[in-house]
């Protein structure tokens, strides 16, 4: 496996024999043969202690309730330079499982259009793939016979490039699987079970083009003597700032599907360049990678209407 791994906050009773499965443990228990050279690299102190969550790169400090410097946020994906020739050779003729993660938490938001402390992590679009993530995926494509991308995140990340990449064999959403969810992920990857879920979010080509993004920020009450306009956000004074969600209900699919309908019907100036991610006339096909409710299966389904019986009284039976 390449990439990061996160799970939701769970509570287990170890004394009662309960276990928490990370992705490595789950894959091993389900009979997968893993690349030990790659595992040793990721677990080494140089890598594990510097990058990823243990390296201090998680949600804090993103853009939330009490952080003075949101620009310090980093994905923490390790650079291409950590992969030695021997490690890369060990990945030849294998199936690469690339894990993409973004943390999430209440009271915190990702802040678009900010400058990162690390040039390899681009945060004009924090839900887009960073340069290091892109480089890691290219390495996987170069050395492995098949590449599967696992989205270990609740956030709908920007993956339009992966969707259109013929070198990517599959993209699987895992969310935050908790204590045992990776066992189910392993069953999906092996084909033991047939995936049939559908995503509950819209995966946008560029999340920053959505109207809700315009309202992101920290706005302090300037007439508040305790805080003032230059105050640092802390746990004690977090009630001194506000956010106006003027987009109303039009977040996620409610925005994209409503504007799509208006675009088709030629109303509401829906096809203007306003809110377009590419500067051209707004076009649903260019704004949405995966729509709300999207999902694939290992099999195919067919729905057929056999007959329709319309009664004189106005009722119909199909």
Pin down the residues of each PLM region.
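C-terminal non-catalytic regions of proteins with extracellular/luminal or membrane-system context
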Residues: 1-318
């Amino acid at each position: 496996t390449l990439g990061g791994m996160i799970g939701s906050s769970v509570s287990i009773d170890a004394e009662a024999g309960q276990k928490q499965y990370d992705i490595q443990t789950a894959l091993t228990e389900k009979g997968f043969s893993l690349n030990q050279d790659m595992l040793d690299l990721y677990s080494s102190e140089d890598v594990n202690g510097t990058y990823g969550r243990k390296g201090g790169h998680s949600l804090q400090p993103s853009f939330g309730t009490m952080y003075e410097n949101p620009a310090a946020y980093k994905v923490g994906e390790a650079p291409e330079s950590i992969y030695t020739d021997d490690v890369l050779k060990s990945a030849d003729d294998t199936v690469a499982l690339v894990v993409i993660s973004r943390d999430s938490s209440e009271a915190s938001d990702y802040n678009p259009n900010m400058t990162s402390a690390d040039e390899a992590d681009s945060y004009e679009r924090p839900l887009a793939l960073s340069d290091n993530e892109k480089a890691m995926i290219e390495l996987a494509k170069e050395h492995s016979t098949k590449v599967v991308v696992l989205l270990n995140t609740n956030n709908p990340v920007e993956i339009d490039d992966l969707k259109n990449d013929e070198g990517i064999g599959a993209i699987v959403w895992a969310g935050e699987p908790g204590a045992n969810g990776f066992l189910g992920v392993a069953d999906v990857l092996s084909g033991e079970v047939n995936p049939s879920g559908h995503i509950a979010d819209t995966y946008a080509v560029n999340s920053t083009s959505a109207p809700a993004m315009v309202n992101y920020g920290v706005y302090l009450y300037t007439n508040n003597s305790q805080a003032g306009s230059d105050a640092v956000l802390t746990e004690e004074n977090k009630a001194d700032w506000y956010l106006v969600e003027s987009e109303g209900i039009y977040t996620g699919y409610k925005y994209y599907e409503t504007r799509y309908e208006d675009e088709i019907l030629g109303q509401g100036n829906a096809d203007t360049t306003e809110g377009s991610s590419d500067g051209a006339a707004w076009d649903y096909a260019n704004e949405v990678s995966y729509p709300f409710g999207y999902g694939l299966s290992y099999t195919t389904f067919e729905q057929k209407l056999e007959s329709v019986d319309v009664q004189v009284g106005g009722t119909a039976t199909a």
